[in-house]
């Protein structure tokens, strides 16, 4: 775990920061789609500005694969979601169906219900591994600068959560492909 800050965050926000160690990456995590040229250039521009402000800027990235991030969402979120939905359905008398849940939510529920406790335990092991990899990475830097999205913002409707025929693996991959740099932080717990 990281140590508590020496001063409150509010106090820190009112003063110029000390010289920061800022890692940056324009390369998507292994297995993820390549970031769009506009997104990569924005990172390079921001890195250059940080360097001009006196920070120590260097290229670097944690060794977390895109599949690790996707698998956590798929194999941890789905069974947790299934348990929560079952509880709410029991309390409300509603059932899981198209009138209450989008197609991709139903696909995640099906995936979660089909998992064994052993599979969930293995997925939680991936959460721990991702957390440790990120922790090691941040011992060498204070900030990691990346694109938020792998491409410019998508038009409304491209990520259609009610798309029939999309299974849990496909849906999670589709979502994580949009923001592959952020996915690992959600996957770390």
Regions found by a protein language model. Give the residues of each.
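Flexible loop/turn segments at secondary-structure boundaries
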Residues: 30-32, 66-67, 152-155
């Amino acid at each position: 775990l990281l140590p508590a800050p020496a001063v409150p965050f509010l106090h820190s926000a009112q003063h110029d920061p000390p010289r920061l160690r800022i890692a940056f990456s324009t390369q998507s995590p292994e297995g993820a789609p390549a970031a769009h040229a506009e997104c990569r250039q924005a990172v390079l521009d921001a890195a250059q500005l940080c360097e001009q402000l006196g920070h120590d800027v260097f290229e670097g990235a944690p060794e977390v694969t895109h599949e690790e991030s996707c698998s956590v969402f798929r194999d941890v979120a789905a069974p947790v979601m299934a348990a929560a939905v079952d509880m709410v359905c029991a309390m409300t008398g509603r059932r899981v169906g198209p009138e209450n849940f989008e197609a991709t939510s139903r696909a995640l529920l099906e995936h979660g219900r089909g998992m064994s406790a052993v599979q969930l335990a293995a997925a939680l092991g991936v959460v721990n591994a991702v957390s440790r990899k990120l922790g090691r990475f941040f011992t060498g830097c204070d900030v990691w600068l990346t694109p938020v999205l792998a491409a410019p913002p998508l038009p409304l409707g491209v990520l259609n959560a009610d798309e029939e025929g999309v299974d849990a693996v496909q849906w999670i991959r589709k979502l994580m492909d949009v923001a592959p740099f952020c996915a690992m932080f959600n996957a770390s717990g």
